[in-house]
């Protein structure tokens, strides 16, 4: 007999494309309890493959299929690590919620429905792990006229909401997004703000060969170029009204290079560009907080950007009167929030309960999200 209880695994590989974050969560209590956590870095070749698949290219179907196989093996490695940490067997887990790697996200375009594509091989993961897998969470919301993103605001409300005050939860991954949590009975809203770490990671990789800017130290050594910042913020996405979502297929290296190419004036140092990109991330978030969450007095940050001290300081400067904290101040590691969300979404699917918030995504209504791949 399988003694699964209410234990689920959530695995998230986000737009930063640095690897997979995974958690084993017990939902039997009042709050989710993380029993184990793991991070599995992507091999360089897999990260490069997913980077190339963000934009049109040759032989995409073949390359995506092989990348999906490789990702399933990375995810299966996470599962093995989690079970070992917790001293559990595959039969002790109800399901895995596997997000996959977003390679295109274009809801509402082309034919009014558009599409979103997360590369992965859930059937292979189920085969390797011996656990039911729930995947493809976003497409059902898109089919209902929604953006398919963000999907974590419902969990943000459960973990960080407070009936006594309005709060904002901000995830800074490759793309940044916010969840506005009202302090009353008002509706939760959420949307993508713009680039988070994606362009920062690209630029430091190109210039210094480093995967990321540790604590934002390189950005802090440069100066913000106001002309370049204004050119970036002139992109129509920043002034579009929510619900809205975006991805690396908009904010990609060519997007940055085009703005650098049209800039006039004295030459910028590479560190100046990095400082300006960090300022772009912070300013896009701050603008949206001011426009859509004016009563909020607390901004709670998660994701890799929460460890970028330069961005965090810029946020505090741009939002006077707002306490800027991280989810770790509330007992949740910054790297675990989205993985917990996909464990929760898998549970919602198996229980046939909605996983989206229609006021966030713009969908026609609540929908059960995900497709089930039995073990």
From Swiss-Prot:
Gene3D superfamilies: 3.30.420.40. GO terms for molecular function: ATP binding; kinase activity; phosphotransferase activity, alcohol group as acceptor. Keywords: ATP-binding, Carbohydrate metabolism, Kinase, Nucleotide-binding, Transferase. Belongs to the anhydro-N-acetylmuramic acid kinase family. It is an enzyme of class 2 (transferase). Its EC number is 2.7.1.170. The lineage of its organism: Bacteria, Pseudomonadati, Pseudomonadota, Betaproteobacteria, Burkholderiales. ATP binds at residues 14-21. Catalyzes the specific phosphorylation of 1,6-anhydro-N-acetylmuramic acid (anhMurNAc) with the simultaneous cleavage of the 1,6-anhydro ring, generating MurNAc-6-P. Is required for the utilization of anhMurNAc either imported from the medium or derived from its own cell wall murein, and thus plays a role in cell wall recycling. It catalyses: 1,6-anhydro-N-acetyl-beta-muramate + ATP + H2O = N-acetyl-D-muramate 6-phosphate + ADP + H(+). GO terms for biological process: 1,6-anhydro-N-acetyl-beta-muramic acid catabolic process; amino sugar metabolic process; peptidoglycan turnover. Signal peptide: none annotated. This is Anhydro-N-acetylmuramic acid kinase. HAMAP family: AnhMurNAc_kinase (MF_01270). Pfam families: AnmK. InterPro entries: Anhydro_N_Ac-Mur_kinase, ATPase_NBD. CDD domains: ASKHA_NBD_ANMK. SUPFAM superfamilies: Actin-like ATPase domain (SSF53067). Pathway: Amino-sugar metabolism; 1,6-anhydro-N-acetylmuramate degradation; Cell wall biogenesis; peptidoglycan recycling.
């Amino acid at each position: 007999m399988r003694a699964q209880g209410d234990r689920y695994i959530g695995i998230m590989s986000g737009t930063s494309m640095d690897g997979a974050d995974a958690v084993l969560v017990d939902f039997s209590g009042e709050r989710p309890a993380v029993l184990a956590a793991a991070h599995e870095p992507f091999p360089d070749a897999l990260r490069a493959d997913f980077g190339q698949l963000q934009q049109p290219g040759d032989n995409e179907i073949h390359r995506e299929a092989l990348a999906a196989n490789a990702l399933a093996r990375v995810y299966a490695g996470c599962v093995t690590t989690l079970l070992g940490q917790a001293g559990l067997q595959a039969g002790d887990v109800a399901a895995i919620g596997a997000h996959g790697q977003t390679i295109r996200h274009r809801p509402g375009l082309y034919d009014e429905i558009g599409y979103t594509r997360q590369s992965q091989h859930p059937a292979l993961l189920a085969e390797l792990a011996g656990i039911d897998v729930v995947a493809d969470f976003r497409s059902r919301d898109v089919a209902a006229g929604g953006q398919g993103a963000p999907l974590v605001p419902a969990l943000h409300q459960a973990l960080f909401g407070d009936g006594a005050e309005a709060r904002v939860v901000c995830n800074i991954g490759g793309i940044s997004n916010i969840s506005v949590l009202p302090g009353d009975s008002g509706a939760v809203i959420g949307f993508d703000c713009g680039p988070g770490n994606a362009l920062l990671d690209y630029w430091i990789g190109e210039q210094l060969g480093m995967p990321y800017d540790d604590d934002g130290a390189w950005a802090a050594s440069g100066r913000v170029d106001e002309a370049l910042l204004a050119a970036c913020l002139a992109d129509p996405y920043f002034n579009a009204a929510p619900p809205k979502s975006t991805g690396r297929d908009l904010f990609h290296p060519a997007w940055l290079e085009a703005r650098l190419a049209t800039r006039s004036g004295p030459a910028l140092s590479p560190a100046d560009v990095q400082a300006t990109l960090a300022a772009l991330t912070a300013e896009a978030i701050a603008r949206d907080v001011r426009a859509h969450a004016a009563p909020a007095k607390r901004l709670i940050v998660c994701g890799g950007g929460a460890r970028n001290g330069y961005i965090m300081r810029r946020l505090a400067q741009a939002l006077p009167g707002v306490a800027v904290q991280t989810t770790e101040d509330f007992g949740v590691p910054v790297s675990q929030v989205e993985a917990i969300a996909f464990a929760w979404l898998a549970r919602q699917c198996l229980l046939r309960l909605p996983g989206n918030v229609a006021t966030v995504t713009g969908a026609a209504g609540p929908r059960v999200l995900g497709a089930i791949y039995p073990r």
